Amino acid sequence: MFSDDKEANKGTIKLAYAQQDDQIVSTNVIAQVLEEQGYKVDTTSLDIPVTWEAVSKGEVDAMTGAWLPITHGAEYKKVKNDIDNLGPHIDKEAKLGLVVPKYMDVNSIEDLNNQANKKITGIEPGAEIVDATNETLKAYPNLKGWEQINSSTGAMNAELKRAIKNKDDIIITGWNRYWIFQRYDLKYLDDPKGSMGKAESINTIARKGLKEDEPEAYRILDNFKWSVKDMESIMLEIENGKDPEKATKEWIDNNRDKVDKWTEK
């Protein structure tokens, strides 16, 4: 995925990721940092269950897309004795929820009554957040008669843009590590019943033996810590048309104090 002018003089690190924005961005960042330290980095896109299997079998060295303890809890349970869980690089900031523009005079799901024609604008059917929203419609008595409208993430983004331009009411399904939070003034609605789920962490997972085989790379992966805001800032640059590799490099260059903590010995 990446190129580096200088000749790598260390080993090759193999990273796996799924085709999700948060995994792509975090993999890009840690790959470029490893390359700066002299490693050659190979990245492979796999389905989520296969990423776990590949790390557990030692077919790849690491991944940065482990949502724990809930979303990937079943995958983790299957292989937890065959991997090293290096802990969160995003600590308890990954969440799903119902999101509205800040100009709307509602702060909780319980405040909803007839806003936006009793419609929640969602994404593709089958996504986890779609199921959570359907559970929320059942959990809150004030949402009786409401419905979730599903099409695509792009269509939801277009509806959000239109609504904000006109200062119309809109309720969308939202999640942290998404560029819309950097572009618009949005807020999560409180979820006292917890039907949208709790905030999770995104962890780095390494294969057994990587610590002994490549101790410096292992240490960098172990030290990798940043925030949802960091991640979303890169996503926004890419959404605005910047080349992903360039957007990643610029973030690294502008956050040397943070990156230096990952690479310090």
Residue ranges and their predicted role:
Residues 27, 47-81, 158-159, 179-184:
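Pocket-flanking alpha-helical
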Residues 80-129:
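A conserved helix-loop-strand patch within extracytoplasmic ligand-binding domains
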Residues 29-37, 116, 122-148, 253:
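Ligand-binding cleft/hinge of the Venus flytrap
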Residues 60-64, 132-194:
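Ligand-binding pocket segment of bilobal, Venus flytrap-like solute-binding proteins
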Residues 7-22, 34, 39-44, 117-121, ...:
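Short, well-ordered beta-strand elements
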Residues 11-13, 21-24, 136-144, 153-167, ...:
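An extracytoplasmic/periplasmic, membrane-proximal ligand-sensing/linker region
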Residues 95-105, 200-214:
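A bilobed periplasmic-binding-protein/Venus flytrap-type ligand-binding module shared by bacterial periplasmic
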Residues 18-21, 42-54, 148-159:
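Short helix-initiation/N-cap motifs at beta->coil->alpha
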